Amino acid sequence: MNRRWVLALFAMIVVLSGCSSSSVGSGAGGSSDEHSGQDGKTIEIATMAVTPYLDEAVKRYKKIRPDIQIDIKEYLARPQTEEGTSSEAFSKSDVEKYVQTVSTQMMSGKGADIIVMNDLPQDKYVAKNMLTNFYDLMDQDSDFDRNQYYQNIFENSQDGDGLYAMPFSFVIDALTGNTELLEQANIEIDDKTWTWDGFKEISKKLKEQVGEDYVAFVNLFPIQMLAQYIEANYDKLIDQGQANFDSDLFRDMMKQIKSMYDEGVLKAEFSYDYSKTLFNKANLFDPMSGLSQVLDPKLKLYQNPTVNGKYNGTPFKSYFTLGINSKSKVQDEAWNFIKFMLSEDMQSSPVVQGFAMHKGVVEKQLNDAKQQAVAGTLPLLEQKFDAETVESKIQELHQLIDGASRNLSSDQKVVSIAIEEFDSYMSGQKSVEDVSKLIQNRVNTYINE
């Protein structure tokens, strides 16, 4: 795989969403000063690009707090449109510009009051006391009831004992298997103990049953697989500011990935034929699609395999998190805005991507989905289900949500370094030992910058 493909595929990994319109600036500079408008103060928000949820929150907040000015600074490598927005996917250059610009501002003691934390080196910011601990703000605010929210998501989004990046929604990460194919091959899966090596052997057995033109996952490339491995094991690969890539753990990861492509379980080529997949990535994006997936009789939902067969809880991911600059002079105003974004009213917005953090909102959405399932109008499933079956599946979803305890979060710069060096191992140019040492040295250099 040449460098152009490496960069192109990395861009696929960092793509999260397009953007929508809002009152955005050019990203010309940061702000930690207390700005005074005609009637109040100004909150500055730094983001790579405006998300629909942030856009709607700003517009609605201005109606109830006209005394607060909110300025959004977008940082994109490509030119912006007249309205400061773009419908294009984020590129690697966009991510690099955002990380570099915001990090430079934060290191100098400046920067925006609120920062979109996704893709930023959060652990570095926390180590240098650049972010405010949300738990402190919650404890000081008698109007905020944290019990209305999923505590396990808060707790597993922490750095140490503090919460420095506020999640507003989350997605459950899992995979699905074809029920009929698995039954025909007489395969039973214990997803609490299975490993990627076990997954490979199961896939090979299924291929013998249905044909060699099948693959475990369609359109899953080696660097995507590597990025997923790193995310799932990030706390072991970066432990208390120390890199652990020159280790048997990481070398075994690389060997597992290479063996799956060498043995034909996966193919590093694009295909439009998704009927030739044995398994599917099954991210549960929201209550309605989640219920559809667990109700589908053709599919069986599984936890992802692990490197060592040790189940550590359901993995989840938050695609939109916010931090508050510890140097901000409008921290109270920033917290009030974020608290508004966590309100039941805002969390009920259709632009929320994922399961809302507000438990009451999720309960209502699950109840609505249940009624649709019983009536036979649930999207993707053109059949009716009895209320008892639907309720049992809703309880399965609750178990997944309540068991979510592994935050799939990583420093994209670390992932980028690993991807750049990994290709030389996949192509046979370098040994797994040499590549792990190269990655270790480069990551350590980056960490110590």
Summary of predicted features, one role per range:
Residues D67-Q148, A185, L278-F279:
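Extracytoplasmic "Venus flytrap"/periplasmic binding protein-like
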Residues V15-G18:
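C-terminal motif of bacterial Sec signal peptides marking the signal peptidase cleavage site
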Residues S103-T104, G111-D113, S142-L181, Y302, ...:
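A structural signal for short loop-to-beta-strand junctions that line the ligand-binding cleft
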Residues S36-V50, A57, I68-Y75, D113-I114, ...:
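Short, well-ordered beta-strand elements
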Residues T176-N178, K317-V330, S349-Q353, M357:
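A bilobed periplasmic-binding-protein/Venus flytrap-type ligand-binding module shared by bacterial periplasmic
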Residues E56, M225, R251-N336:
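Extracytoplasmic/periplasmic substrate-binding proteins
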Residues Y135-S142, I153-P222, K236-K267, S326-D332, ...:
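Helix-loop-helix "hinge/cap" segment bordering the ligand-binding cleft or interdomain interface
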Residues A375-I447:
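C-terminal capping/gating helix-and-loop segments adjacent to ligand/active sites or protein-protein/ligand interfaces
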